[in-house]
């Protein structure tokens, strides 16, 4: 129907994108700092912080590359807040004065749920001091047993000298105090949780700031009132519930996925009906006036966004996790 399409940021599939008029994607998961991209088949490294770079590329495409006489569909896919939660340099001190409340089930004993106890996403035993919590000391005295220490040190070494100077100013005192305190047991577990939460929230703050940049561009260029904006993720995440980080296990914290939609003229407030990510494609096609292919999974929830009642809307969902052993050793369920 005449739409220009673009994919910018995290792709994380084996193949290169097809069916897009323009694409500029991170290689693999992408790196937080000085990430490598593939731009329409050509590899290029860009200096800076991934969240800012992806946003810069997206705004540049809207402003300077697309044909402004045509409608467009743009996917802006960020690496953040994926592991390892490396904050932007300007956010390193953010929330320093905050102590995050512990989830009530942080020390879950998994009574009657033995399979849930046999995984490798425990903050206490699986969150790596160097890879996840940035304890890459220059004396090389902090060592870990998860197999991720080298990768953590490589992430630090990938920073340029200017970036390292700012990074060190923040983390060197934290590393020194950690060595001095020699934490064990619950004290270590709760220290890990606080470090994790601080870095995660800093990374989220950067996402929030950059979403604001996109919205500001749309507003300033008269695009807000004829553009549907979708903010979502590929799953929820554990923020210490059951003592975990990551996702995969089908408790509500992981199963429920963020989804915010702004549809000009659409319903305001919450929509209570259950939707899935397989519904996104049909919804976007429906809005664009394109017939949804018969073999496409999911259904359009555009009527729900307009405030319409759909009497036969789904009342249940099916979940199946089958990738065992794979990463984090979550059992099939």
Residue ranges of each PLM-predicted region?
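Ser/Thr-centric signal marking residues that sit
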Residues: 5, 51, 55, 227, ...
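Catalytic-site neighborhoods of secreted/periplasmic enzymes
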Residues: 1-55, 61-69, 78, 82-96, ...
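Conserved beta-strand edge residues that scaffold enzyme active sites
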Residues: 11-14, 232, 298-299
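Short alpha-helical patches at coil-to-helix transitions and adjacent helical residues
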Residues: 51, 55, 204-211, 277-281
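Alpha-helical elements of Rossmann-like donor-binding domains used by nucleotide-donor carbohydrate transfer enzymes
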Residues: 57-60, 213, 279, 300
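C-terminal cap/loop subdomain of S1 sulfatases and analogous C-terminal strand-loop tails that border
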Residues: 19-22, 71, 84, 235-241, ...
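Active-site-proximal cap/lid insertion segments
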Residues: 30-46, 63-70, 75-226, 230-274, ...
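Generic enzyme active-site microenvironment
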Residues: 8, 232, 277
């Amino acid at each position: 129907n005449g739409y220009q399409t673009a994919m910018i940021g995290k792709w994380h599939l084996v193949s290169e994108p097809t069916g897009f008029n323009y694409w500029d994607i991170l290689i693999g998961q992408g790196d937080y700092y000085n990430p490598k991209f593939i731009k329409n088949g050509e590899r290029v490294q860009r200096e800076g912080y991934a969240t800012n770079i992806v946003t810069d590329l997206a705004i540049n495409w809207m402003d300077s590359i697309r044909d402004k006489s045509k409608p467009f569909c743009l996917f802006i896919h960020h690496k953040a807040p994926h592991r390892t939660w490396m904050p932007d340099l300007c956010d390193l001190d953010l929330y320093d004065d905050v102590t995050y409340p512990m989830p009530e089930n942080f020390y879950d004993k998994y009574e009657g749920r033995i399979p849930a106890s046999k995984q490798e996403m425990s903050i206490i035993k699986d969150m790596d001091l160097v890879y996840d919590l940035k304890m890459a000391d220059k004396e090389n005295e902090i060592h870990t047993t998860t197999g991720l220490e080298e990768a953590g040190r490589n992430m630090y070494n990938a920073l340029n000298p200017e970036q390292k100077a700012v990074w060190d100013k923040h983390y060197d005192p934290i590393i020194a105090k950690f060595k001095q305190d020699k934490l064990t047991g619950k004290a270590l577990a709760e220290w890990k949780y606080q470090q994790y939460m601080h870095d995660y929230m800093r990374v989220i703050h950067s996402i929030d700031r950059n979403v604001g940049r996109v919205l500001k561009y749309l507003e300033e260029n008269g695009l807000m009132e004829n553009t549907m904006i979708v903010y979502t993720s590929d799953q929820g995440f554990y923020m210490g519930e059951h003592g975990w980080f990551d996702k995969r296990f089908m408790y509500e914290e992981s199963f429920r996925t963020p989804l915010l939609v702004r549809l000009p003229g659409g319903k305001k407030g919450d929509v209570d009906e259950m939707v899935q990510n397989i519904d996104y494609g049909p919804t976007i096609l429906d809005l664009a006036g394109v017939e949804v292919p018969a073999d496409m999974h999911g259904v359009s929830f555009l009527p729900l966004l307009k405030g319409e009642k759909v009497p036969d809307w789904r009342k249940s969902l099916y979940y199946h996790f089958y990738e065992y052993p794979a990463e984090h050793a979550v059992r099939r369920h």
